[in-house]
């Protein structure tokens, strides 16, 4: 319906340009998420990433991202505070991760917005809705010029993905192949 012009989205708002926060507030007692070997995270946008903000699947994804040579950085998107997608339902979608892949050492050429889902949620109506929204977002990003997305996005690929607990690693391997 969107492509046949039977349905249109009307965007109303004041601020459309998401920027990563310059700092984050954490509880003084919060424990930091470290790599599996106990070392500090190296590719996270922030040095301190609170471990209690991750479920087990999200931790596994973060550790996986830490080991990727093509990764420029990854960011744990905080629910109800950071980047969100407003679809046709009342509540916004807050993806779990935003990360960038690169072909060079000093810039990135791909941006990924990723939502992870446990096995028990994979066939839910909410997950189906998120898949539909992410598919629309990916198609819209592909059809937009860098002038519409902003100069910083010139020649960048943007993909939105919902990854199931039992397939996230295989999908990320495909996405991050050189």
Place the predicted regions along the sequence by residue.
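Intrinsically disordered, low-complexity, repeat-rich regions
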Residues: 1-93, 100-178
């Amino acid at each position: 319906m969107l492509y046949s012009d039977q349905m249109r989205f009307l965007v109303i708002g004041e601020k459309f340009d998401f920027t990563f926060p310059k700092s984050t507030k954490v509880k003084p007692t919060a424990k930091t998420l470290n790599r599996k070997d106990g070392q500090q995270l190296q590719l996270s946008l922030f040095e301190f990433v609170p471990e209690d903000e991750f479920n087990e699947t999200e931790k596994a994804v973060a550790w996986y991202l830490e080991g990727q040579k093509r990764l420029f950085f990854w960011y744990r998107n905080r629910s109800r505070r950071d980047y969100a997608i407003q679809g046709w339902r009342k509540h916004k979608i807050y993806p779990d991760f935003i990360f960038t892949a690169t072909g060079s050492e000093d810039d990135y050429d791909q941006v990924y917005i990723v939502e992870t889902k446990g096995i028990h949620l994979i066939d839910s109506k909410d997950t189906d809705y998120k898949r539909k929204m992410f598919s629309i977002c990916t198609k819209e990003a592909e059809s937009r010029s860098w002038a519409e997305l902003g100069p910083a996005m010139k020649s960048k690929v943007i993909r939105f993905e919902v990854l199931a607990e039992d397939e996230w690693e295989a999908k990320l391997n495909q996405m991050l192949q050189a």
